[in-house]
């Protein structure tokens, strides 16, 4: 499938996780707090909670890094009462040239869809609303004509049928996660046509075997899964944004010829998401 589409031709186009990132949605963590614990990472950091100034400083460095690599960054407006807004990946996703509006599971996050819906309307972006199911963008990973969908705490198996109906030209592949793991991108991420990061213990054996036949898998150790070693962000041309503390992951990627941009996102990670979670790509090229 041709991915060499000029930036100006489409308002949304994403066909891989590793094509050159051209336009992406983020949101500042201005109201970030661990209020209602909704994942295992938050349980660990509930007493420490979030230092909002530190989180904002770290987020600003991520935005600066993206812009310095010629990525157009769209910052959504922040709203009171939405402490998880920083994790823009979950509220929507783009597959091919089609945008989708997610259906959020947790009540504390359910106001976030309205913000991205307002943005879509303001930009004249048509979208498909996922109804009568639950699905979040952290469970959606694309690789050309294949879409992997995590079946998790946040995404229900009923979403598969809706995606198949909306995307008949794609193969939709469900990937069952063990219950404690939040999203597919917390344990799996494709970084090239042939390579992917994985924490295989989080994935049902049949699904892990299927992925091993398709990709050269780079195993993430347990301690670096906790700091979301798989949740890197590829910006194209074998350049990846990753956490400095995930040394094993970064060393393995460097050995394979990837350029690593290390940014500290440790304050935001306390709430259960890292670089991929904080970014919703609108346009990727080759």
Swiss-Prot record:
GO terms for molecular function: arginine deiminase activity. Keywords: Hydrolase. It is an enzyme of class 3 (hydrolase). It comes from the Bacteria. One of its GO terms (biological process) is arginine deiminase pathway. Its EC number is 3.5.3.-. The active site is at residues 183, 277. PANTHER family: ARGININE DEIMINASE. Belongs to the DDAH family. This is Uncharacterized protein YkgA.
């Amino acid at each position: 499938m041709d991915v060499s589409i000029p930036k100006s031709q489409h308002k949304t186009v994403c066909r891989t996780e590793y094509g050159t990132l051209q336009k992406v949605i983020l949101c500042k963590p201005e109201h970030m707090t661990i209020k209602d614990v909704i994942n295992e990472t938050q349980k660990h950091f509930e007493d420490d909670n979030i230092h909002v100034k530190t989180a904002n400083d770290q987020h600003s460095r991520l935005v600066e890094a993206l812009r310095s690599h010629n990525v157009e960054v769209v910052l959504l407006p922040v709203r009171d009462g939405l402490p998880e807004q920083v994790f823009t990946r979950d509220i929507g996703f783009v597959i091919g040239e089609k945008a989708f509006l997610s259906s959020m599971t947790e009540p504390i996050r359910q106001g976030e869809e309205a913000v991205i819906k307002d943005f879509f309307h303001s930009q004249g972006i048509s979208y498909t609303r996922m109804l009568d199911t639950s699905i979040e963008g952290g469970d959606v990973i694309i690789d050309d004509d294949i879409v992997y969908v995590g079946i998790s705490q946040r995404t229900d198996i009923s979403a598969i049928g809706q995606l198949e109906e909306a995307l008949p030209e794609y193969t939709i592949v469900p990937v069952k996660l063990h219950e404690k793991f939040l999203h597919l991108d917390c344990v799996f991420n494709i970084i090239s046509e042939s390579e992917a990061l994985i924490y295989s213990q989080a994935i049902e054996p049949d699904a892990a075997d299927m992925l091993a036949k398709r990709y050269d898998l780079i195993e993430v150790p347990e301690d670096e899964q906790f700091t979301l070693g798989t949740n890197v962000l590829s910006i194209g041309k074998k350049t990846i944004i990753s956490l400095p503390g995930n040394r094993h992951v970064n060393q393995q990627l460097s050995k394979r010829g990837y350029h690593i941009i290390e940014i500290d996102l440790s304050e935001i990670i306390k709430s259960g998401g890292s670089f991929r979670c904080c970014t919703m790509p609108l346009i990727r090229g080759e």
